[in-house]
Swiss-Prot record:
Miscellaneous section: Has a similar 3D-structure to Cas2 proteins.
Purpose: Antitoxin component of a type V toxin-antitoxin (TA) system. Neutralizes the toxic effects of toxin GhoT by digesting ghoT transcripts in a sequence-specific manner. In concert with GhoT is involved in reducing cell growth during antibacterial stress. Overexpression leads to transcript level reduction of 20 other mRNAs involved in purine or pyrimidine synthesis and transport. Not seen to bind its own promoter DNA.
Keyword terms of this UniProt record: Endonuclease, Hydrolase, Nuclease, Toxin-antitoxin system, Transcription, Transcription regulation
Protein name: Endoribonuclease antitoxin GhoS
Assembly behavior: Monomer.
Disulfide bond residue pairs: none
Residues of the signal peptide: none
Outcome of mutating residue 31 to L: Protein becomes toxic upon overexpression. Becomes classic type II TA toxin protein, increased cell persistence to ampicillin
Top EC class for this record: hydrolase
A Pfam family reported for this protein in Swiss-Prot or TrEMBL: GhoS
Disruption phenotype: Essential; cannot be disrupted unless ghoT is also disrupted; in the double ghoS-ghoT mutant has no visible phenotype. Increased biofilm formation after 8 hours at 30 and 37 degrees Celsius, has risen higher by 24 hours at 37 degrees Celsius but has fallen by 24 hours at 30 degrees Celsius. Approximately 2-fold increase in swimming motility. When single ghoT mutant is grown in the presence of antibiotics carbenicillin or cefoxitin initial metabolism is significantly increased over that of wild-type, after 14 hours wild-type is slightly less active.
Gene source species: Escherichia coli (strain K12)
Length: 98
């Protein structure tokens, strides 16, 4: 049986109260340390800057595994409560430009 690695590009968006803005600077650094990016190519291959609360990654992980990884890494941050939305890059741009 031949194994295939299927890679997908996901965009992770955070939603948090504005009072957490200083903590978000640490979160942003953490995301970059985990190889997330703030720029991603759209379906036409054009690089696009994501909004300030969004990050992209190309990975073989499933969306649920990405969320688990982020929440695990965030345990070192101060006790914050944030919503996390993970979608494929195509879904992100469809939602963003509709």
């Amino acid at each position: 049986m031949e194994g295939k690695n299927k890679f997908n590009t996901y965009v992770v968006s955070f939603d948090y109260p504005s009072s957490y803005s200083s903590v978000f600077l640490r979160l942003r650094s953490l995301m970059y340390d985990m190889n997330f990016s703030s720029i991603v190519a759209d379906e036409y291959g054009i690089p696009r800057q994501l909004n300030e609360n969004s990050f992209a990654i190309t990975t073989s992980l499933a969306a649920s595994e990405i969320e688990d990884l982020i929440r695990l890494k965030c345990l070192d941050l101060p006790d914050i409560d944030f919503d996390l939305n993970i979608m494929t890059v195509d879904d992100y741009f469809r939602q963003f430009y509709k």
